[in-house]
């Protein structure tokens, strides 16, 4: 790395990322103290030293927070545009005025600059860039290749296992539905390898005709491999040939008076027809493509993405990128694409609803990244145009629903402010709940709601840690949750009047301090929360409301508790009551889900996990040899040493672990 006049000349990708993403607030502040400039004058000073080369620039405010990340074919020319005092739209004018420091990285090519820009925008969340929200990884279906009886699984994350991967699918529910159908059509197992190895009789899935039970050899290895081959062919787009083969097999079985087998083929055919009927539009001439369409209205953009693989429609997903209203739809779409594919596999063909700037550059960047040719196309006619139109209709309709929902939420938030006598309409509402069974596996949960709905990437869960809390003490649990939540907030950002309700790092337009706290509980819970808030000096900064069920615990008879006020109820048909119930129920759902996951993890905890040097391979060997953890615990030292991969030293550790307790 060569650094000269705040310009980094990096030799490799790692150096570029390291330099641009690890500058500290102190570094930026100290550098700005040296030049004593801000805004356009500051930028003019930097322009003097910039080369006529491609690269990435970063604009930083006085607090060291990144305002904007951009790329340029020519850094000197591009950044010079910001030195003019006039002629900019409101967004760029505000950005220039807030700039207190800049950082630069010179790259070898403009393609490198484009890829680096997308990576940094996703990592740094600059508030003046177009930001991709809800960027979850996509689920895949895998058929394993590392076992005599391949299994069918849902998969997310890295492709570390030896298997055939089919996807991406637009949603987890789409994968689950497809797997259910594949089970009915091809009878493949979905159990883990360890479960399969230790079964002595078929499970319930065999009884209901969802599995062929290779675990107990109810089917020969050869016949099972044929089922696996059929499932792979179907997922590869050869559905018609698979159905033709099944029809012939069904007729043959019926001709031989094997009506039970014929009925089985009939049911499998029905399952395949069912999934195809729910796939909507399927292309006839396109094997692999992603289709993007954007719709804009009232400053909000919706991008609809459809995934077509193996000639099949594998679902769609809607995105609402955060972008200033001054961005055009083509600018939003271009930025969205570069961020979207930053960590996702690329299809051969990408279809767009409208032209974007630097389309050729983006195609070259994607081709370089994928190590094969990637085409970006704006179709004018034919099947490709039909697919784009289909995506645009969906984007337009989804945006309409979003706008209606936002308008409804705005009215509801205004109503909440009026009912609870808040000083202003709340922007952020936090709802808390606890979940446990007689004090065991106790967890606290926090969900967050804003005017655009639930902000799920800001949900938080709290494992109750304190040993001083009596099992089942809901008040004590809530105290711990509130104390941990707001102690950390104060530690990181100071008190609300000091932080000026600064914005969340996950969403630059969303505050980190709640205007309203909702608690699932009555007077006791409210008093518990206020006790902690008083200790932290926060008692006067936010309103706390408790929602308690009525005497008969029926929905619609909730009582609301606010400190210093008489408890009250709302009319049973009041839409604000329904909304508050929905907030409460979402917190309850999240808390119960977290508790169940913790309880399940505890239940499935293997005693072998506590022993040093016992990894997955040795654990699998032990379970395969003995059949259960209980049998391992009662095994003799001599028996343990007979297990393949278990040395005398390891066997002694296992024996001591179970016999010294």
UniProtKB/Swiss-Prot annotation:
The keyword DNA repair applies. The keyword Cell membrane does not apply. One of its GO terms (molecular function) is excinuclease ABC activity. Residues 52-130 form the GIY-YIG domain. Pfam families: GIY-YIG, HHH_5, UVR, UvrC_RNaseH, UvrC_RNaseH_dom. SUPFAM superfamilies: C-terminal UvrC-binding domain of UvrB, GIY-YIG endonuclease, RuvA domain 2-like. One of its GO terms (cellular component) is excinuclease repair complex. Keywords: Cytoplasm, DNA damage, DNA excision, DNA repair, Excision nuclease, SOS response. One of its GO terms (biological process) is SOS response. InterPro entries: GIY-YIG_endonuc, GIY-YIG_endonuc_sf, GIY-YIG_UvrC_Cho, Hlx-hairpin-Hlx_DNA-bd_motif, RuvA_2-like, UVR_dom, UVR_dom_sf, UvrABC_protein_C. Coiled coil: none annotated. Residues 240-275 form the UVR domain. Gene3D superfamilies: 5' to 3' exonuclease, C-terminal subdomain, GIY-YIG endonuclease, UVR domain, UvrC, RNAse H endonuclease domain. It is found in: Cytoplasm. Interacts with UvrB in an incision complex. Belongs to the UvrC family. The UvrABC repair system catalyzes the recognition and processing of DNA lesions. UvrC both incises the 5' and 3' sides of the lesion. The N-terminal half is responsible for the 3' incision and the C-terminal half is responsible for the 5' incision. This is UvrABC system protein C. It comes from Bartonella henselae (strain ATCC 49882 / DSM 28221 / CCUG 30454 / Houston 1). The gene is uvrC.
């Amino acid at each position: 790395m060569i650094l000269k006049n705040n310009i980094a000349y990096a030799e490799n990708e790692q150096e570029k990322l390291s330099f641009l993403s690890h500058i500290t607030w102190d570094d930026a502040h100290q550098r700005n103290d040296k030049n004593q400039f801000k805004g356009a004058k500051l930028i003019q000073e930097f322009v003097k030293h910039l080369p006529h080369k491609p690269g990435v620039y970063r604009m930083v405010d006085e607090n060291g927070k990144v305002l904007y990340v951009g790329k340029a074919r020519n850094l000197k020319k591009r950044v010079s545009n910001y030195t003019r005092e006039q002629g900019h739209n409101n967004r760029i004018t505000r950005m220039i005025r807030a700039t207190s420091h800049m950082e630069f990285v010179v790259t070898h090519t403009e393609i490198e600059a484009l890829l680096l820009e997308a990576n940094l925008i996703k990592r740094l969340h600059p508030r003046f860039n177009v930001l991709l929200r809800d960027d979850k990884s996509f689920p895949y279906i895998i058929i394993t290749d590392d076992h005599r009886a391949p299994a069918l699984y849902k998969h997310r994350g890295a492709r570390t296992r030896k298997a055939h991967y089919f996807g991406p699918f637009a949603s987890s529910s789409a994968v689950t539905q497809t797997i259910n159908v594949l089970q009915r059509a091809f009878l493949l197992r979905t159990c883990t390898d360890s479960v399969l190895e230790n079964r002595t009789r078929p499970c319930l899935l065999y009884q209901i005709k969802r599995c062929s039970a290779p675990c107990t050899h109810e089917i020969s290895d050869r016949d099972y491999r044929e089922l696996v081959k059929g499932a792979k062919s179907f997922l590869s787009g050869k559905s018609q040939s698979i159905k033709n083969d099944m029809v012939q097999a069904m007729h043959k079985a019926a001709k031989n008076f094997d009506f039970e087998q014929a009925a089985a083929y009939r049911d499998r055919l029905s399952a395949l027809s069912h999934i195809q009927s729910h796939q909507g539009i399927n292309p006839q001439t396109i094997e692999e493509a992603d289709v993007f369409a954007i719709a804009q209205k009232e400053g909000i953009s919706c991008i609809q993405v459809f995934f077509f693989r193996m000639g099949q429609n594998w679902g769609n997903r809607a995105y609402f990128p955060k972008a200033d209203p001054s961005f055009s739809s083509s600018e939003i779409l271009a930025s969205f694409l570069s961020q979207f594919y930053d960590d996702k596999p690329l299809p051969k063909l990408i279809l767009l609803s409208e032209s974007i700037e630097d389309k050729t550059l983006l195609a070259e960047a994607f081709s370089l990244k994928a190590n094969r040719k990637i085409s970006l196309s704006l179709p004018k006619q034919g099947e490709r145009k039909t697919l784009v139109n289909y995506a645009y209709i969906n984007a337009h309709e989804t945006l309409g629903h979003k706008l209606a929902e936002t308008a409804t939420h705005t009215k509801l938030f205004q109503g909440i402010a009026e009912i609870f006598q808040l000083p202003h309409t709340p922007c952020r509402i936090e709802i808390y709940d606890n979940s446990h069974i007689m004090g065991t596996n106790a967890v606290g949960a926090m969900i967050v709601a804003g005017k655009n709905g639930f902000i799920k990437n800001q949900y938080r869960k709290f494992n109750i840690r304190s040993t001083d809390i009596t099992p089942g003490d809901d008040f004590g649990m809530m105290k711990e949750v509130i104390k941990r939540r707001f102690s950390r907030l104060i530690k990181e950002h100071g008190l609300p009047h000091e932080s000026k309700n600064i914005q969340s790092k996950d969403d630059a337009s969303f505050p980190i301090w709640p205007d309203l706290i909702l608690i699932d509980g009555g007077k006791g819970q409210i008093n518990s929360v206020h006790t902690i808030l008083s200790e932290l000096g926060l008692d006067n900064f936010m309103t706390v409301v408790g929602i308690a069920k009525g005497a008969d615990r029926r929905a619609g008879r909730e009582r609301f508790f606010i400190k210093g006020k008489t408890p009250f109820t709302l009319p049973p048909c009041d839409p604000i009551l329904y909304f508050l119930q929905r907030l409460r129920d979402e917190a309850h759902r999240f808390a119960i889900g977290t508790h169940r996951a913790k309880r399940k993890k505890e239940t499935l905890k293997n005693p072998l996990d506590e022993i040093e040097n016992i990894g997955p391979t040795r654990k699998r060997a032990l379970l395969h040899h003995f059949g259960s953890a209980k049998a391992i615990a009662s095994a003799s030292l001599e028996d343990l040493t007979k297990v393949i991969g278990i040395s005398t030293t390891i066997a002694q550790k296992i024996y001591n672990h179970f016999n010294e307790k």
